């Protein structure tokens, strides 16, 4: 699924209209999609739904939704920012729907009456084409709505049964058409008066602003609904959002006559006296998504600890100095590493392994690489390090590590994560996995894809080790670097979503992801 700018979406809609899928038809489908989503959350009959309607097409989408919910038995109220008179308004008047306009309601008494007991508020005030600061009547309207919503939610009662608190329902449910009014759909900026949504329904494609903060945090659950546009109209758009269909097409096959060699051998060069968990997390993750054989190349001083933590791995104890891999480990590692499909280097190494990393990336070639954590931090200290790394490696930095690799500030990286990832993937000749909410995968040829996950449950120690092991396993099973990175990140994100739904956003530990990785793989493939 592609991610589009406002201008790209405008061109797609214009081309669709010119080819026979008219604006009116697209509006009917858009409004119907919002109605369908609302009805999937609550019974329409008997529900009270308040629509906040602006003067443009976003308001038109809202009016179509209002008509359809009225026909489904909902009690509908329409509150207009400005008076409007079109076929949608005529249809609602014929149905006896309550309609009020802000200029005719100077005390907002009609608005307040509906806000006091509605079940759903639909924000259809401004859509993707608006980027100006909120002001005037629109600002006043949103302030009134926000105040009433806050007051209602503060009064909600927590029921208690058997001394176990029951979660209070969020009432009213706030649904945004395209996204909350005040969102800039090109850069994710958010007006301070924007009304955060519980869910947003956007059309045809997600917009760039849906994936960039702070705006992304105000969209709630994002649902993308088709409106009849031709997918071919987006073929020239580079930025994509990963989805199950795409990932399924890339996942490695599992032939019935396979043996463990079929699914690749992963060498994991990792660990230190201070970090004995990282190698185990990475190795277990690799096995959990299908790697045939995993070998842990770790400091010999922690070999006993390693062998007690994991039964399935094989081991290559290497020389170390004070618990970190030493320069002397390089020759022993090189004697074995050529027979492996991929090498993951970095989890838990610590920066005390500097001489080891410096020597390893000299001389003869290495197998395909996934570089994580302290491998990245140590490479960043080497001038023109990317020329010493066999291309295309997969690099998995978080923003702090990316800052060290690039020399940029974290703030500069976070300001435009996609552009930064693409720029340096091209420059370095390696695949970049820039971790974080909506992780970015960028390839040297300019391809890029965003993960659809913004999950605080993944912000936990060891989560990156699980990700690195998952990506390494995908690479070992024969995927190209870009596809391996995308599949690994998607499986990791899906496992994180499963853990969050079962456990909550707090309390998930990296080990919780391991048991869910096979379930994530099963759910996609």
Question: Can you say where each PLM-predicted feature lies in the sequence?
Answer:
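Internal gly/pro-rich beta-alpha loop/helix module
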Residues: 120, 125-241
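Nucleotide and nucleotide-moiety/phosphate-recognizing core
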Residues: 36-127, 131-177, 359-362, 386, ...
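Small-residue (G/A/S/T)-rich helix-start motifs and N-terminal tracts that mark the onset
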Residues: 1-81, 197-199, 208-369, 377-395, ...
């Amino acid at each position: 699924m592609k991610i589009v700018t406002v201008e790209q979406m405008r061109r797609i809609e214009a081309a669709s209209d010119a080819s026979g899928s008219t604006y009116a038809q697209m509006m009917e489908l858009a409004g119907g999609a919002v109605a369908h989503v609302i009805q999937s959350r609550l019974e329409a009959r008997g529900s009270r739904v308040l629509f906040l309607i602006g003067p443009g097409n976003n308001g038109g989408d809202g009016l179509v939704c209002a008509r359809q919910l009225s026909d489904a038995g909902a009690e509908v109220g329409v509150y207009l920012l400005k008076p409007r008179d079109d076929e949608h308004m005529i249809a609602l008047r014929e149905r006896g729907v309550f309609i009020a306009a802000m200029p005719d309601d100077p005390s907002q008494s009609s608005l307040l009456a509906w806000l006091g007991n509605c079940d759903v508020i639909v924000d259809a005030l401004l859509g993707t084409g608006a980027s100006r600061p909120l002001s005037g009547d629109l600002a006043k309207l949103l302030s009134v709505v926000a105040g009433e919503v806050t007051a209602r939610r503060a009064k909600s009662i927590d029921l208690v049964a058997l001394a176990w608190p029951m979660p209070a329902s969020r009432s009213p449910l706030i649904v945004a058409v395209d996204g909350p009014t005040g969102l800039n759909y090109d850069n994710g900026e958010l007006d301070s008066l924007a009304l955060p949504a519980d869910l947003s329904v956007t059309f045809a494609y997600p917009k760039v602003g849906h994936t960039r903060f702070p705006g992304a945090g105000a969209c709630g659950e994002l649902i993308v609904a088709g409106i009849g546009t031709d997918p071919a109209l987006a073929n020239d758009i580079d930025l994509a959002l990963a989805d199950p269909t795409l990932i399924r097409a890339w996942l490695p096959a599992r032939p019935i006559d396979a043996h463990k060699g079929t699914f690749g051998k992963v060498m994991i060069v990792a660990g230190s006296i201070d970090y004995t968990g990282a190698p185990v997390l990475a190795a277990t993750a690799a096995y959990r998504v299908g790697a045939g054989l995993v070998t842990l190349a770790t400091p010999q001083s922690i070999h006993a600890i390693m062998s007690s933590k994991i039964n399935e791995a094989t081991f290559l104890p290497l020389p170390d100095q004070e618990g970190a891999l030493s320069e002397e480990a390089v020759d022993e590692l090189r004697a074995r590493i050529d027979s492996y499909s991929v090498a993951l280097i970095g989890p838990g190494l610590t920066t005390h392994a500097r001489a080891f990393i410096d020597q390893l990336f000299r001389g003869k070639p290495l197998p395909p690489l996934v570089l994580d954590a302290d491998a990245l931090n140590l490479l960043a200290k080497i001038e023109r390090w990317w020329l010493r790394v066999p291309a295309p490696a997969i690099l998995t930095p978080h923003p702090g590590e990316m800052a060290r690799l690039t020399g940029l500030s974290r703030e500069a990286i976070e300001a435009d994560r996609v552009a930064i990832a693409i720029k340096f993937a091209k420059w370095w000749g390696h695949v970049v996995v820039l971790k974080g909410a909506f992780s970015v995968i960028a390839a040297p040829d300019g391809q890029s894809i965003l993960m659809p996950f913004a999950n605080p449950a993944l912000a936990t120690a060891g989560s990156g080790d699980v990700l690195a092991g998952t990506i390494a396993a995908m690479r070992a099973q024969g995927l190209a670097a870009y596809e391996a990175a995308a599949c690994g990140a998607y499986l990791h994100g899906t496992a994180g979503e499963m853990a969050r739904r079962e456990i909550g956003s707090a309390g998930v530990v990296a080990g919780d992801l391991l048991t869910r990785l096979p379930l994530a793989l099963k759910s996609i493939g």
